[in-house]
Amino acid sequence: MSTNPKPAFRRILLKLSGEALMGDEGFGIDPKVLDRMAQEVKELVELGIQVGVVIGGGNLFRGEGLAKAGMNRVVGDHMGMLATVMNGLAMRDALHRAYVNARLMSAIPLKGVCDDYNWAEAISLLKSGRVVIFAAGTGNPFCTTDSAACLRGIEIEAEVVLKGTKVDGVYSDDPMKNPEAVKYDELSYTEVLDKELKVMDLAAFTMARDHDMPILVFNMNKPGALRRVVMGEEEGTMIRAK
């Protein structure tokens, strides 16, 4: 039983890495993981929470290697944007199969595939109880999907950006490599910068800080973690102004 009968947040922006959709696969989308995530999002909708979603594209395309081999960075980033659209289509389909109304909005026009991003329409859809998936990043090269998540979170006036990762919060060091790494329950923006902790890229993080947007990092692969986060229970690491 939750200690809080009501959710801690009314409107959230959920950021999922493309890698989270891979599950144990080395590439692509694991249908079981996709369906589980859709069910967890459905739980939030049933709690009355308005949910915006941004998904990365790293499970389908990573431009760094090709950029090092000589590919133009802008071309690589455009390909990465299209990878996020593919993930968005998969998530929208999974939500529809779970009987959740969802809309997919893209920052680059893809007529007949998904809707163009429209700020006012997105807020209207969220208020009506639909999940809104934001694809194609910010629509600009040189911007990460973490930047897109913070930007969309600020635009839709979300109360928090929930960053779903493979680890259950922010640590003093990489917990996969250092067993003595310490997990933080709460941090200020300044502490993250001073300790040089890896939460997200600097452009995305400073955008969140400048607009007072809290970031909560948690393990999306941990069953029930998302629900615990939105109910205000102890889960993950909260980063905000102190």
From Swiss-Prot:
Catalytic activity as recorded in UniProt: UMP + ATP = UDP + ADP
Chain positions recorded as UMP binding sites: G57, D77, T138, G139, N140, P141, F142, C143, T144, T145
Enzyme class at the top of the EC tree: transferase
Protein residues bound to ATP: K15, L16, S17, G18, G58, R62, T165, Y171, D174
Single GO BP term: UDP biosynthetic process
Modulation of this protein's activity: Allosterically activated by GTP. Inhibited by UTP.
InterPro entries: AceGlu_kinase-like_sf, Asp/Glu/Uridylate_kinase, Uridylate_kinase, Uridylate_kinase_bac
Alphabetized Pfam families for the sequence: AA_kinase
A GO term for molecular function: ATP binding
Entries under PANTHER family matching the protein: URIDYLATE KINASE, URIDYLATE KINASE PUMPKIN, CHLOROPLASTIC
Protein name from the UniProt record: Uridylate kinase
Organism this protein belongs to: Shewanella sp. (strain MR-4)
Lineage of source species: Bacteria, Pseudomonadati, Pseudomonadota, Gammaproteobacteria, Alteromonadales
